[in-house]
Amino acid sequence: MEKIKQPVLVLVGPTAIGKTALSLQLARQFSCEVVSMDSMQVYRHMDIGTAKISKEEQGEVPHHLLDIVEPDEHYDASMYCRDALRTITEIHARGHIPLVTGGTGLYLQSLTKGFFEGPPSDSAVRERLQEELDNLGPEEMHARLEQLDPLSAQRLHPNDSYRVMRALEIFAITGKPWSQLLSQHKPENQFANMLQIGLTCDRPLLYDRINMRTQIMLDAGLEEEVRGLLDMGYSRELRSMGSIGYKHMANFIFGDWEFEEMKTLLARDTRRYAKRQYTWFNKDEDLHWYQKESKAEIVDRVGQWLEDQLSKNL
């Protein structure tokens, strides 16, 4: 596959670090269109719990890959890769710069280095596994994966039935763990000119910001948003509804947790998610890390890089 030669900017970092504000600044200054890289912001009706950018801000700067599927629709990294590549091509055709921003590391990997899909699905195997899932439940299927492919089981939540089932299907078809096949996949960046910037800050500051964001979401009406989703018929068992914030509020609404317990666990699990994001992004050698306070330095770096790209094409 021939590499994409037009410039692409990427801005990543953990949740609550301040990516949205900086992405808007960069987009206004350098004629960018933002391509969301968030596995939860693809869902319609899920705005507060995903910290989705406001409609007003979307009106100021074009944003893409927000609100593209319903909460009960399947959407994964391979689909994101397809949609993001198409969107980036369209932005280049308009003479603008794509600014890919978000915190979903798997989406970045699928976009830059391609997505390892494994062998084609086998309908007979899928039907058998689905029947077993219906009879045994997700916890038992995850436990089975833990025996066959512990590395995949470690990174997959028991409620992520789609990926657990896919990992079991791959083992049934090939006799090899998905994690082993994935480790043998040697991808390279399919973009010839991409600048990847990571935002970071001291952990205590980030955790304070996460605690503040938790309160802001609750004050903004997270409970009403989740009740609305439930009233629309979206089950709390859905993958989208099992995500941080929605799962916690549903547990409160159904009486599983008291309010203060829900609030404490929501902040705690968001902090844990931020740690997992750091773990993922720290493995990416193409990322250039900056302190979140260094906005002027980042703007200068982006400006110089874009000038260099322009001069190369003259």
From Swiss-Prot:
Keywords: ATP-binding, Magnesium, Nucleotide-binding, Transferase, tRNA processing. InterPro entries: Dimethylallyltransferase, IPT, P-loop_NTPase. Substrate binds at T15, A16, I17, G18, K19, T20. The record marks T104, R126 as: Interaction with substrate tRNA. Pfam families: IPPT. It catalyses: adenosine(37) in tRNA + dimethylallyl diphosphate = N(6)-dimethylallyladenosine(37) in tRNA + diphosphate. It is an enzyme of class 2 (transferase). GO terms for biological process: tRNA modification. Its cofactor is Mg(2+). ATP binds at G13, P14, T15, A16, I17, G18, K19, T20. GO terms for molecular function: ATP binding; tRNA dimethylallyltransferase activity. Residues 38-41 are annotated as: Interaction with substrate tRNA. Its EC number is 2.5.1.75. Belongs to the IPP transferase family. Monomer. Catalyzes the transfer of a dimethylallyl group onto the adenine at position 37 in tRNAs that read codons beginning with uridine, leading to the formation of N6-(dimethylallyl)adenosine (i(6)A). PANTHER family: TRNA DIMETHYLALLYLTRANSFERASE (PTHR11088:SF60). HAMAP family: IPP_trans. NCBIfam families: miaA. This is tRNA dimethylallyltransferase. It comes from Desulfotalea psychrophila (strain LSv54 / DSM 12343). The gene is miaA.
